[in-house]
Amino acid sequence: MRLPWELLVLQSFMLCLADDYTLHGPVFVQEPSHVMFPLDSEEKKVKLSCEVKGNPKPHIRWKLNGTDVDIGMDFRYSVVEGSLLINNPNKTQDSGTYQCIATNSFGTIVSREAKLQFAYLENFKTRTRSTVSVRRGQGMVLLCGPPPHSGELSYAWIFNEHPSYQDNRRFVSQETGNLYIAKVEKADVGNYTCVVTNTVTSHQVLGPPTPLILRNDGVMGEYEPKIEVQFPETVPAEKGSTVKLECFALGNPVPTILWRRADGKPIARKARRHKSSGILEIPNFQQEDAGSYECVAENSRGKNIAKGQVTFYAQPNWVQIINDIHVAMEESVFWECKANGRPKPTYRWLKNGDPLLTRERIQIEQGTLNITIVNLSDAGMYQCVAENKHGVIYASAELSVIAESPDFSRTLLKRVTLVKVGGEVVIECKPKASPRPVYTWRKGREILRENERITISEDGNLRIINVTKSDAGSYTCIATNHFGTASSTGNVVVKDPTKVMVPPSSMDVTVGESIVLPCQVTHDHSLDIVFTWTFNGHLIDFDKDGDHFERVGGQDSAGDLMIRNIQLKHAGKYVCMVQTSVDKLSAAADLIVRGPPGPPEAVTIDEITDTTAQLSWRPGPDNHSPITMYVIQARTPFSVGWQAVSTVPELVDGKTFTATVVGLNPWVEYEFRTVAANVIGIGEPSRPSEKRRTEEALPEVTPANVSGGGGSKSELVITWETVPEELQNGRGFGYVVAFRPHGKMIWMLTVLASADASRYVFRNESVRPFSPFEVKVGVFNNKGEGPFSPTTLVYSAEEEPTKPPASIFARSLSATDIEVFWASPIGKNRGRIQGYEVKYWRHDDKEENARKIRTVGNQTSTKITNLKGNALYHLSVKAYNSAGTGPSSAAVNVTTRKPPPSQPPGNIIWNSSDSKIILNWDQVKALDNESEVKGYKVLYRWNRQSSTSVIETNKTSVELSLPFDEDYIIEIKPFSDGGDGSSSEQIRIPKISNSYARGSGASTSNACTLSAISTIMISLTARSSL
């Protein structure tokens, strides 16, 4: 056993190394777990894992059933990185409980216990079994009698070399392996073999066959259920486990199995019943699943009940563990650990792997450990152990006891402490020391004595209040304990206090104004000073709120605040805070902002009629300026936004909180809001009122644009614009259509009960074509009839023209254009003519695909464009009016001319001499399917102009008189009876810079743009004839 002095030296040495290495006791990273090892495993090796960290590296040893495992005495054992390896494990020698023990210079900890068991399954000893003889209808049990084994088993049966399936008549108990047949039938005769499987090793063995035969002495009569398989009276179930309860009965008829809880509670929905209902399975078992369960077996002869109690248990589980503690000598240690479990866990404590008992300084009470007046011998590894009959858990922690002389190396006194006259100063003295030292203070060379101004706290800090200039100087803290003495010195510098000379003053301003709140001080200029401002308790961010706030002043003793374009939101308390390294002070002012009123509140519709609404409201904040008036606004589903409405009184003053809105439309849903105003401006509107609909009234607005005409023979068509919904004044809105022949006295009336109706057609054989009628349209709703529209004249449907146009003639103008001529119909024509319709189609097309164009009025010719060249077209003409088209004229034929030449002029050459430009080009030859060339068009323009001039010539040259200071853009194309041919590429002729120049169509030139000349002289000279 080490002496306390040796422990102190060792601990001091470890603390010296702490800067480079983290020294600590053992800590389990992985603890051993229970192992079920298959005896027939091909890998003849068992590993019990144990991984530990610590510094110094811990030494690992193992215990088996409480006795140390001697690795050196048995070559089969080895420890690899803490884990225990057992080669060729032996069931007799190696079965038992193992524990890993880890030790280093800080102490020892023990792991949880881990059991090593061996799984095996031997063969059945008996070779044959006796024949079982039963009556038909009798219940039967075939015993399995599994051979010696270790590890969980599963059971099945083979019937005549085939698996025996379980159903409501047959059941295999997984507890005993026995096969139960509730009621034997003739088909059950045969050989039965029990099949046993070890679920750990997967090894399977078959029992000897048991023959089953039927007796010849009759059939078993009916009898009530006899429960042969039932779960125990008490079934302990672990938290989170899967619980299986078995129950099966013999009987005739075959009994049904029903499960229920004896306390009347429903069985959890998560529970499952197997095919035969002989097993009730409850997964993830919890406290609420515990209770009394009943199995009810019933048939027509009666029923029987088996009962059992399923109890809940849980292994201990940590709720609170212990943690490492570093404590100074002579102080106290308190640890507490808590664990859940059922039954409730008990606690014990270990120190360095050995039991820890209560004695003078050590008090143990359940999960608490209290050590007083700690000394070096208390250092070590501690473990709290919580256990119940279902398990044991361990929590570990290290207790380090610190013993050292006072040391200021890392906690020197502050070199300079600044304080103001009249202020307070605290000089901290925090040396590292264990146990706690005794403190004394010196000022200069004199020991400080406590008085009403000077106190020394228990933890060594020096406090001086009401500081004066004489308190300046050097101060030394001296710390002493059993192991030595140390000191540290610092200086106190006393400064004059800061004073606010010009504080901010409260002000009353108007929205939009700008002000400056002053904040000017006197202070010790050897100290840095910082001004900050808060607004309603929040620090002003001058970067974020720079649009409104700015620091002004220009000197270190002034921190004035400018507020620009003040808004209502800027009203509140402003605080100027001044801080130096020795003091902090503040000055506050209130800013009152006058502005437009806030929104009125609680706008309510007190009463509403067909055209009025009585409103009331509560005033909102006046923002420090009396409200002078209110404006009422309304909105409907048909309005564009909010609209001001008329009220009584016409002007609502600021002391009136009710008004009547007039001029509303009946049967329209309205909502209202109020806007307040004062001398400063108009405020925000109130929240909208509830929506209310005005009452119904007679309609007052008549349809607009009453007209008509058209339609079919013997019809009078009357049309109008519907009355908007907001002007219909009520439900059941419709129209009354009145009409009479012009000059007659009696009106004919028709009622249309639809607000959407906008057209009425009167049909009668007596209606003559294009006869005038007087027409008016009235309105009505559920309240009654409203007015009629003004009377207007509408003509009945007219008759389409009855005669075709005469003298149809067509001529070709070009390859794409033709012109058509005709004369008005000859003889009496009953229908009015509004114009003519020309139909045309190519000879290769069908007439039904013909195109049509129309003329208006008396026009008797038209031009048709965009046709195909050298193609035969057929044309016919009809007269038309609103009733339709009349008969068609006879068709005439016309052939468009051949297309113009497709080849553009080539080999274009130009020469300039004596201010003239002479252009020459090759003659264009038309193809066989093209019309002959009649001449050429020369298109030219100045470089900076968009308008183009044209010269026509039947020659292949042209002479132009051009200015000297402008480029020319020129194109040339042929023309023929078929129209204009393809154009040449554009030619740029540069301005004339010398007396002679020449070029071709491919040449280019860089030209400078000069001022335009207003006149161009052009002369033509024939070079060759076509």
UniProtKB/Swiss-Prot annotation:
Ranges where the Fibronectin type-III domain occurs: 599-697, 702-799, 804-899, 900-995
Region (Disordered): 685-710
Record's subunit section: Interacts with PTPRG.
Keyword Signal carried by entry: yes
SUPFAM superfamilies: Fibronectin type III, Immunoglobulin
Free-text tissue specificity from the UniProt record: Specifically expressed in the nervous system. Not expressed in heart, spleen, lung, liver, kidney or skeletal muscle. In the hippocampus, it is highly expressed in CA1 pyramidal cells and weakly expressed in other regions of the hippocampus.
Annotated compartments: Cell membrane; Secreted
Location, primary (coarse class): membrane
Species of origin: Rattus norvegicus
Ig-like C2-type domain boundaries: 32-117, 122-206, 225-311, 316-400, 406-493, 497-586
UniProt name for this protein: Contactin-4
Organism classification: Eukaryota, Metazoa, Chordata, Craniata, Vertebrata
Domain of life: Eukaryota
